């Protein structure tokens, strides 16, 4: 019974209760729990967009091939490495979706990026994507892919034709994307990489990664200086108003989303610990070892802070806020770039940021 209860807890911790998966047996769940608790590398699979029309698709493949400088490989295993070969492939794909052959706003291709963190061998990523694409799309859809190594994290751009050989079109849903992450993680493990595909929440992470657009804005480029994004500036001003209201004695604003995150994390962490307790009661030494790994994993999880909590803590530290002196809080009418640091003052009382 302990293993059955352990399985139930692991499923809950991995947010699998309502999702149909491949081969979700106890052995597989325990193996997943082991990889997660060991800190296995997490894969990234993302749909970046869809191609509509020959011109759009040609531009996308030109980018993926770096205008013929990066080789493309297709679903038949054919590799195109010369600029002439690559240009011919791009031209062929583009002409197939000329305007007179398609409906308006029709999605012709799906664009995906499959990525691994810095330090993973790029060729292993490419090999895993080759196996993944063949398994997921190879029977019914044409595709091409290209490995990019111009950034620290190796990644592959995969372009798939939406229309299948059987006349049906791809219609990817959220569950499909999650299954594809699982499939890619398995393909990476076949390459010798300890990889997993679990939700951020199952690992105790509540913040979404910063979007590429915001990173680009704040980093700047050849034509734009680094600057704070409007999204971040507005979030800061919203938190400033909240702090001012609390200093003036107003009750904190109840945020339903924060409460939901906190409750979910309590449930997930409780489920992990429940699994650890059940595994500890089994006679199998490997289960007892896994129990200890899970307990250490939960103990090392980050504090349950949302992005708003982090902004609030950062502003409190930045301005050394005194409860009795609301004047040190910048005015709500200011932009974030106009805010100036006030003189140092007495540290504020610690506040519970998890409510």
Name each model-derived stretch:
Residues 1-355:
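N-terminal nicking endonuclease/strand-transfer module with a His-rich metal-binding environment
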């Amino acid at each position: 019974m302990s293993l059955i209860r352990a399985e139930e807890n692991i499923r809950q911790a991995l947010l699998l209760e309502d999702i149909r998966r491949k081969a979700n047996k106890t052995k597989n769940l325990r193996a997943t729990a082991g990889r997660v608790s060991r800190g296995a590398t997490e894969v990234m699979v993302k749909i970046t967009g869809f191609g509509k029309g020959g011109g759009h698709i040609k531009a996308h493949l030109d980018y993926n091939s770096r205008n013929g400088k990066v080789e493309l490989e297709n679903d038949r295993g054919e590799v195109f490495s010369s600029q002439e070969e690559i240009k011919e492939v791009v031209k062929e794909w583009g002409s197939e979706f000329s305007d007179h052959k398609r409906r308006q706003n029709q999605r012709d291709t799906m664009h995906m990026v499959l990525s691994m963190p810095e330090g993973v061998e790029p060729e292993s990523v490419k090999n895993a994507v080759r196996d993944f694409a063949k398994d997921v799309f190879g029977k019914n859809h044409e595709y091409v892919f290209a490995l990019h190594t111009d950034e620290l994290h190796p990644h592959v751009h995969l372009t798939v034709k939406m229309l299948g050989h059987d006349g049906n079109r791809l219609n990817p849903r959220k569950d499909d994307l999650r299954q594809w992450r699982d499939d890619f993680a398995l393909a990476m493990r076949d390459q010798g990489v300890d990889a997993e595909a679990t939700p951020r929440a199952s690992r105790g992470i509540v913040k979404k990664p910063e979007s590429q657009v915001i990173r680009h804005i704040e980093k700047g480029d050849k034509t734009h200086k680094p600057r704070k994004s409007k999204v971040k500036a507005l979030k800061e001003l919203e938190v400033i108003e909240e702090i001012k209201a609390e200093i003036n004695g107003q009750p904190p604003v109840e945020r339903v989303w924060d409460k939901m995150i906190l409750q979910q994390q309590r449930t997930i962490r409780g489920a992990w610990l429940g699994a650890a307790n059940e595994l500890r009661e089994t006679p199998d030494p490997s289960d007892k070892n896994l129990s200890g790994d899970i307990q250490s994993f939960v103990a090392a999880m980050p504090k349950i802070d949302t992005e708003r909590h982090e902004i609030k803590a950062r502003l409190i530290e930045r301005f050394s806020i005194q409860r009795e002196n609301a004047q040190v809080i910048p005015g709500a009418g200011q932009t974030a770039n106009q805010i100036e640091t006030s003189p140092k003052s007495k540290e504020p009382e610690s506040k519970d940021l998890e409510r």
